[in-house]
Amino acid sequence: MLHNPEKVAILYWLHLKEHTDVFTQGYVGVSTRLIDVRFREHCSRFNNSYNQYNPLHLAFAQYGVENIIKTRLCVCSIDQAYRLENIFRPFEYMGWNTAEGGKLSKTAINIIKSKYT
């Protein structure tokens, strides 16, 4: 991975109140910012570019952003956070995630490539 191993990150879980299984339900992510800041970014993307194929966007639309719970799972090095994320999301499209843990989605990679090529 190409991350600064010294940088601190948060492994977080976005889920509904009734969700009990972090391995199969909700969204697991990594951020080097506060969870509330990262959550606002997710909400902004949802509000500005709704994607009907994005499970997190579908959850926001179906359940309402106000019903999503933000849970901090771990504060650790960024490398450790991505390794843990991969344990919770080893495959694409698990829970509300589109990419396997520790990796960018193909859509994100294509956007980055288009900006720099």
Residue positions per predicted region:
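Structure-specific nucleic-acid interaction/processing domains
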Residues: M1-T117
